[in-house]
Amino acid sequence: MPREVLSILVDNHSGVLARVSSLFGRRGFNIDSLTVSATDDPEISRITIVVHDDVKVLEQIIKQTARLEETRAIFPLNTAHSLLRELLLVKVAADEANRTAIREIANIYKAKIIDLSIGSMVMELTGRAGKDRRFSGCAFTL
């Protein structure tokens, strides 16, 4: 099944995310990814949801989400004309013995080390779908 991305403009107040996500859950729709952010208008938020479903199920999702009182607009994004990126933040155990090896792996994947402490390291990785899965599949201890 193809990956579909929905951009939903909703009223910016508490409980809206819960209503949208519970609609998906009650109907048995699986959410692969969910992001919520503010817009230029402080009264409106944008919810971006990624799902893997067929066209008929996607149409049903769009219709039911559009019926929610807080929904202002819903747009399916054309993934062929969109730049889709994923973000991974991972904290790993990093002592003197393995810190160099972890840095080498981070460099291969172009991950940024954003925090370093005595016993751990936090890395950030952005890229196309799948890059984060390959990176997190490396032999790290969390």
State the predicted function of each range.
Residues 1-45, 50-142:
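Long, contiguous binding/interaction regions
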